[in-house]
Amino acid sequence: MADSVERLRQRVEELEQELARERTRRSGGDGHCGRTRIQEMSDEVLDSNPYSRLMALKRMGIVSDYKKIRTYAVAIVGVGGVGSVTAEMLTRCGIGKLLLFDYDKVELANMNRLFFQPYQAGLSKVHAAEHTLRNINPDVLFEVHNYNITTVEHFEHFMNRISNGGLEEGQPVDLVLSCVDNFEARMAINTACNELGQTWMESGVSENAVSGHIQLMIPGESACFACAPPLVVASNIDEKTLKREGVCAASLPTTMGVVAGILVQNVLKFLLKFGTVSFYLGYNAMQDFFPTMFMKPNPQCDDKNCRKQQEEYKKRAAALPTQEAEPQEEAEVVHEDNEWGIELVSEVSEEELKNSSGPVPTLPEGITVAYTVPKKTEDSASEVTVEDSGESLEDLMARMKNM
């Protein structure tokens, strides 16, 4: 019985792929890529070189070697509003391999977000995304899985693929990206990555569609998703009970694009080692506010593998050689006497300096004055008086005219 169900499932996937090709053909695409595969990236500035603008990052001193992007494999869980745009950006950047995980189908309700097109409605998101992404960049390797990672059987397969599905079979992926829209899937990814010691990044958009965030999680070094869980997770509330019929979360393509953009930017900085990698970066569209922070791991985390990773990280940190602080040389005091015979002369004479200060009062020991009051000088100009000549104003004006 199980074998027949599996065969039927495979047949359904084959028919879905065939349907995708037929719909693409009818929509005007021939289903084939517009160019052949490029074996090696080139920095040659040509209209026909899709990597010239990317390779310019090396010439401008941003990245030491952009070609390394083709040596990395990234797994994306959730190919929706954020995940599909993230996959597209990484594909255009020339990533080596993408592994896509999602069990949902494309719907017309998804059209307010980015990437998918109306003719793809009814197809699985991973297969529709793979077909489009291959046309964008045939140099990227793709591996798609159309299932729910939170089920027991599929969770084991998910762990197997992120630990063995790297660019070379048997090697782990370099990074896992969470672009899901529920806490159950986030906790599943968190559990898998803590057990495997796999670095991953989490992303999310709020239900009102005007805020979002990304978070980098390195097991043992930074907080995992269970170290400071949301209230829904901490209270063990079933998310499905919170949903109401006829009510859905809001969604803006702008917010999805911003969150996907900062996520991929953080991925590139992490993989290619340039700039500052953010451990947490938020986005509030109402105030254009981008908060950032670092979250330390919780020693009492509910995930035992997280606590285990913390202990291993402490051991690795303790084994590193300690760097002694280098003694700082004190700057030599520069005296007024010098070999060139240059002498500093004050613009104020000794007599003027003496007259500008007053007598120092007698004070108890330990008390000094900040300044003294100079003696009052008698202004001789104030004593000059002019005698009254007795002439009227008219006489004085007449005299001035005759001058």
Swiss-Prot record:
InterPro entries recorded: D-isomer_DH_CS1 (IPR029752), ThiF/MoeB/HesA (IPR045886), ThiF_NAD_FAD-bd (IPR000594), Ubiquitin-activating_enz (IPR035985)
Q: What happens when the gene is disrupted?
A: Death at embryonic day 12.5. Embryonic lethality is caused by severe anemia associated with defective differentiation of both megakaryocytes and erythrocytes from common myeloid progenitors.
Q: Where is this region: Linker?
A: 346-376
Identify its protein family.
Belongs to the ubiquitin-activating E1 family. UBA5 subfamily.
State the species of origin: Mus musculus
GO CC term (a single one):
cytoplasm
Q: Which residues carry this modification: Phosphoserine?
A: S357, S392
- Location of the motif UFC1-binding sequence (UFC): 388-403
Listed binding positions for Zn(2+) are C224, C227, C301, C306
State whether it acts alone or in a complex, and with which partners, per the record. Answer: Homodimer; homodimerization is required for UFM1 activation. Interacts (via UIS motif) with UFM1; binds UFM1 via a trans-binding mechanism in which UFM1 interacts with distinct sites in both subunits of the UBA5 homodimer. Interacts (via C-terminus) with UFC1. Interacts (via UIS motif) with GABARAPL2 and, with lower affinity, with GABARAP and GABARAPL1.
Tree of life domain: Eukaryota
The written remark on domains in the entry is: The UFC1-binding sequence (UFC) motif mediates interaction with UFC1.
* Active site residues per record: C248 (glycyl thioester intermediate)
Gene Ontology biological process terms, A to Z: erythrocyte differentiation; megakaryocyte differentiation; neuromuscular process; protein K69-linked ufmylation; protein ufmylation; regulation of intracellular estrogen receptor signaling pathway; regulation of type II interferon production; response to endoplasmic reticulum stress
Q: What is its main location?
A: cytoplasm
Alphabetical UniProt keywords: ATP-binding, Cytoplasm, Endoplasmic reticulum, Golgi apparatus, Membrane, Metal-binding, Nucleotide-binding, Nucleus, Phosphoprotein, Ubl conjugation pathway, Zinc
**Mind telling me what this protein is named?**
Ubiquitin-like modifier-activating enzyme 5
Explain the purpose of this protein: E1-like enzyme which specifically catalyzes the first step in ufmylation. Activates UFM1 by first adenylating its C-terminal glycine residue with ATP, and thereafter linking this residue to the side chain of a cysteine residue in E1, yielding a UFM1-E1 thioester and free AMP. Activates UFM1 via a trans-binding mechanism, in which UFM1 interacts with distinct sites in both subunits of the UBA5 homodimer. Trans-binding also promotes stabilization of the UBA5 homodimer, and enhances ATP-binding. Transfer of UFM1 from UBA5 to the E2-like enzyme UFC1 also takes place using a trans mechanism.
Residue ranges of the motif UFM1-interacting sequence (UIS)? 333-345
- Residues involved in ATP binding: G81, D102, K125, N148, N182
User: What one GO molecular function would you report for this record?
Assistant: UFM1 activating enzyme activity
Report the subcellular localization. Cytoplasm; Nucleus; Endoplasmic reticulum membrane; Golgi apparatus
